UniProtKB/Swiss-Prot annotation:
GO terms for molecular function: glyoxylate reductase (NADPH) activity; hydroxypyruvate reductase (NADH) activity; hydroxypyruvate reductase (NADPH) activity; NAD binding. Belongs to the D-isomer specific 2-hydroxyacid dehydrogenase family. GhrA subfamily. It comes from Salmonella paratyphi B (strain ATCC BAA-1250 / SPB7). It comes from the Bacteria. Its EC number is 1.1.1.79, 1.1.1.81. This is Glyoxylate/hydroxypyruvate reductase A. Keywords: Cytoplasm, NAD, NADP, Oxidoreductase. It catalyses: glycolate + NADP(+) = glyoxylate + NADPH + H(+); (R)-glycerate + NAD(+) = 3-hydroxypyruvate + NADH + H(+); (R)-glycerate + NADP(+) = 3-hydroxypyruvate + NADPH + H(+). It is an enzyme of class 1 (oxidoreductase).
């Protein structure tokens, strides 16, 4: 079995060595320009077109939960990967736990009004504030995939009313499920904290705009953990300035790194992190990929395959 690996920043030698330990019968190599030798599987992130074009691969693994970058390249270069070759994404590999940590900590931060207390501290004001109640602090999750399910699960223990919005109905315990555009308003109008975990598709680009934000309760919060292109940044800032939104926590941006001139840097009710909510953890990724390859070699059914038409 031949496996090729490409990532523009990862330590290729570490990955090659770890994969060979996990799959003793495999020969693994870092792909370099000019390497046209046969391969059975490819592990990639932002691969050059020539790496995959014309290869008779059994499968390709994208080294992340999001596959929008490789799908965008496939749209521009359909010859890059034959439609018959399955493309897999990393389903969890530790990302679920990271998303849980991030989402729970931020929801609690807002619920306990730590943002307000920080503002008071900056003014040297000692002023206890009225508490929020859990009943008025409904959390809505846009996107009900693997990561959305993990986040909902982690929030259940805290007693917040939970709801999710997705393209198909979910039957998660203790979570109200809303489906499609026709139920979006009903989902939004009782959502105090909006968590975005949608996939990046043509249908979701720019979805968090003024029309959507206007349907949230006054004083709502937005937590974006998915993709920067989901948010119309000017509309978000306008909602913050008007008081429609009380705060926003952003991990992803339309342009990364975020330009220094962006007003998001200076807005007092915007907090941000540099796209670190859930990063690929190599050891767990190796475990998932090696198990999946072993299952494929045995002809067993596997999960994590990308539906190219849907975009996730």
């Amino acid at each position: 079995m031949e496996i090729i690996f490409y990532h523009p920043t990862f330590n290729a030698a570490w990955w090659v060595n770890a994969l060979e330990k996990a799959l003793p019968h495999a020969r693994v190599r870092e792909w370099k320009v000019g390497d046209n030798n046969p391969a059975d599987y490819a592990l990639v992130w932002q691969p050059p077109v020539e790496m995959l074009a014309g290869r008779r691969l059994k499968a390709v693994f994208a080294l992340g939960a999001g596959v929008d970058a490789i799908l965008s390249k496939l749209n521009a270069h359909p010859e890059m990967l034959d439609a018959s070759i399955p493309l897999f994404r990393l389903e969890d590999t530790g990302m679920g736990l990271q998303m849980q940590e991030y989402a729970v900590s931020q929801v609690l931060h807002w619920f306990r009004r730590f943002d307000d207390y920080q503002a008071l501290k900056n003014q040297a004001l000692w002023k206890p504030l009225p508490e929020y109640t859990r009943e008025e602090f409904s959390v809505g999750i846009m996107g009900a995939g693997v990561l959305g399910a993990k986040v909902a699960e982690s929030l259940q223990a805290w007693g917040f009313p939970l709801r999710c919005w997705s393209r198909s109905r979910k039957s998660w315990p203790g979570v109200e499920s809303y489906v499609g555009r026709e139920e979006l308003h009903a989902f939004l109008n009782q959502t105090r904290v909006l968590i975005n975990l949608l996939p990046n598709t043509a249908q979701t680009v720019g979805i968090i705009n003024s029309e959507l934000l206007d349907q949230l309760p006054d004083g709502a919060y937005v937590l974006n953990l998915a993709r920067g292109v989901h948010v119309q940044e000017a509309d978000l800032l306008a909602a913050l300035d008007s008081g429609k939104l009380k705060g926003a926590m952003l991990d992803v941006f339309s342009q990364e790194p975020l330009p220094q001139e962006s007003p998001l840097w200076r807005h007092p009710r915007v907090a941000m992190t540099p796209h670190i909510a859930a990063v690929t953890r190599p050891a767990e990724a190796i475990d998932y990929i090696s198990r999946t390859i072993a299952q494929l070699e045995k002809g067993e059914s596997v999960t994590g395959q990308v539906d190219r038409a849907r975009g996730y």
